[in-house]
Amino acid sequence: MRVLITGGRGQLGTEFAAVCDSAGDDVVLCAHSDLDVSDRDSALQVVGAVHPDVVIHAGAWTNVDGCEEDPSRAYLVNALGSRHMAEAAALVGARLLYVSSDYVFDGRGTGPDGGGAYTEWDPPGPISHYGRSKLGGEHEVAAVLGPAATIVRASWVVGRYGANFFKTMLRLANDREGKPVTVVDDQRGCPTFTADLAVVMRRLAVSRIPGLFHVSNEGPLSWHEFASAIFRAAGADASRVVPIAGADLRPIRPAPRPASSILDNAALRGSGLAPMPSWEGALYDAVAALQ
């Protein structure tokens, strides 16, 4: 299988390439310097030259606060750029897997107490320009490719590559000065480790299953609880992790965050594919890989 990956230098693109390499796939990694998704001609030219069987569109502008301050760029890259990649995939007859986000939801949760998880069939309602631009990308991909597209929503994506919350907390856990670390405790979701996400996405690509899928590791928690678990996994003192309300963070963040964006992998369970493992096991695997 010949696979083209956008966001080739990002944490998910790098992990996905490793999974594909181990499976014997022919992988072409495209960083922004190789393929500018906001430029339609660039997308058509590069994809046309590579002629992949599958396009993994992991490239995006994921700076949530940056998107809030520059919404034009957010929609150009995340929404229109996804249209360009879908058009390019259609021209060569490739399947496309688009990586979306839990930020397409408003964060009020489901159920009477608002603590329930979102399924693929719950209505989205993004509260930030980042979330709206990612939802726009979903619409563009579905409109262009229909059943030749698979949309994967992931939440709190972390892993051994790139810059992410897990690696930041692991570095702080290993800080010999032992300073306290403040972490938000009023936002809940599910971590998604790239090692597990990449495996499931490749299965979806090979199975040629279309539609929308939530793919996150099982088990909801707060950012503070996640940080504390990372400290414990690293053998550090978890009491150094101090809870703080998101509204009390300084400097104030421009973009609102969903208070509860727990994803229910309902479609994945119903598809017959292996379910995502718990985040606890994925966490210890990731710590072992880096320490």
Cite the ranges covered by each PLM segment.
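Adenosine-cofactor binding site in Rossmann-like domains, unifying the SAM/SAH pocket
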Residues: 21-45
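Catalytic helix-loop patch of NAD(P)-dependent Rossmann-fold dehydrogenases
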Residues: 69, 76, 80-84, 104-152, ...
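NAD(P)H-binding glycine-rich loop region in Rossmannoid oxidoreductase-like domains
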Residues: 40-79
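Mid/C-terminal beta-alpha module of Rossmann-like enzyme folds, strongest
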Residues: 179, 200, 207-253, 287
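Conserved C-terminal active-site "lid" loop/helix of NAD(P)H-dependent oxidoreductases
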Residues: 222-228, 246-291
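SDR active-site strand-loop-helix element
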Residues: 6, 30, 55-59, 96-102, ...
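N-terminal Rossmann NAD(P)H-binding glycine-rich loop of SDR-like oxidoreductase domains
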Residues: 3-22
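NAD(P)-dependent short-chain dehydrogenase/reductase
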Residues: 139-189, 194-196
